[in-house]
Regions:
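Juxta-kinase regulatory segment immediately upstream of eukaryotic protein kinase catalytic domains
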Residues: 2-64
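Conserved HxN/HPN-centered segment at the entrance to the catalytic loop
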Residues: 115-134
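Conserved structural core of kinase catalytic domains
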Residues: 128-170
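Catalytic-loop of the protein kinase fold
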Residues: 186-206
Length: 328
């Protein structure tokens, strides 16, 4: 779309559905998004000739940080269509992560997320969107807004209503079916030489309209010395552990409640990344099938063999899936 000049009068008209009109109000208009801290509620961002009304900064809870504000991620209204969109602006950060003895350098890459948005166009298990350059050649991503809750929230809600055994037989089989579809989505990325880069249980949203499990947030990339897909695979393992346990099974909680299995646990039974979480769930819940527990133990501190490819994980998950009765 050709770039247009938007007068203050036109912007007043376009935003009237969402903003109360104030005499003499003037919008701040940005075509260069480099300084994303300056872009605030009620401002206008113009991307490729399309005006967006900025609403709020996105927030995200992670590792106990409730509603951590992400100043480079803006909730907005596409003033052409009236649809809510997420605008991700360019923000660079790096950090190191360790899995066992392997260290990974992680960094944000807008270019990588733009590639993935092109790659996964119309695939149902992925958040959709597109990328565009602003006037300063920043790669901005314009993303659909998915109405729904995270997979983590879904499990927490279930955990307030039933015991684990009831959950495992009544809810887990369907959750496993959807999880496998998500893993198939990651396999698709890997088959095309790409990685998700930040696989977490709160990076799967359950679409309120379709019930579809959908991956979000593809901007992290990983520098690797060994298996380029290893970081994604460990993320998938952590999610599976959470799903199978109806939440994290934490050693300190077991000890505090004087759980009968606590004295049977050894160092090899814990999660390879989070050493306070139990990977060997069969020691806690005897009815966990061996086929599932074998998968979980690939992500334990005592593991000697790891998954190299998502296809290996999917094959083992299919075996677990086949052990549950088919729903009518």
């Amino acid at each position: 779309m050709a770039s247009l000049d938007f007068s203050q009068e036109l912007l007043q008209e376009l935003t009237s559905k969402w903003l109360s009109q104030k005499p003499g109000q003037r919008f701040k208009v940005y075509k260069d998004t480099t300084d994303f801290f300056r872009i605030e509620y009620g401002d206008i961002v113009i991307l490729d000739g399309n005006p967006f009304l900025i609403r709020h900064n996105a927030k995200e809870g992670r590792f106990g940080l409730d509603d951590e504000e992400k100043f480079w991620v803006k909730r907005s209204i596409d003033l052409r269509s009236g649809m809510t969109k997420i605008i991700k602006l360019v923000f660079h950060e790096t950090f190191n992560a360790r899995i066992g003895e392997i260290e990974f350098e992680c960094f944000r890459s807008p270019r990588k997320e733009a590639r993935i948005l092109n790659l996964i166009k119309d695939l149902p298990n992925f958040m959709q969107g597109y990328s565009v350059q602003d006037d300063h050649e920043n790669i901005v991503r314009v993303l659909e807004f998915i109405y729904g809750i995270s997979l983590a929230e879904h499990i927490r809600e279930i955990a307030t209503t039933m015991k684990h055994e009831a959950y495992f037989y009544q809810c887990f089989p369907k959750i496993l079916d959807n999880y496998i579809l998500c893993v198939e989505g990651i396999r698709f990325l890997h088959d095309h030489g790409e990685k998700h880069g930040d696989i977490r249980r709160d990076h799967i949203l359950i679409d309120r309209e379709s019930g579809q499990y959908r991956w979000i947030d593809y901007d992290y990339n990983v520098r690797h010395r060994e298996n380029m897909y290893g970081y994604d695979l460990f993320g998938l393992g952590n999610i599976l552990m959470y799903l199978a346990g109806m939440g994290d099974i934490v050693y300190q909680d077991l000890k505090r409640s004087d759980h009968p299995s606590v004295d049977k646990l050894i160092e090899d039974d814990v999660n390879i990344v989070f050493h306070n979480r139990i990977a060997n769930l069969k020691k806690i819940y005897f009815y966990i099938p061996d086929s599932l527990n074998r998968i979980l133990m690939h992500f334990s501190k005592g593991a000697h063999v790891f998954y190299d490819y998502t296809t290996q994980l999917i094959d083992d998950l299919r075996e677990v899936q086949s052990s549950f009765p088919k729903s009518a």
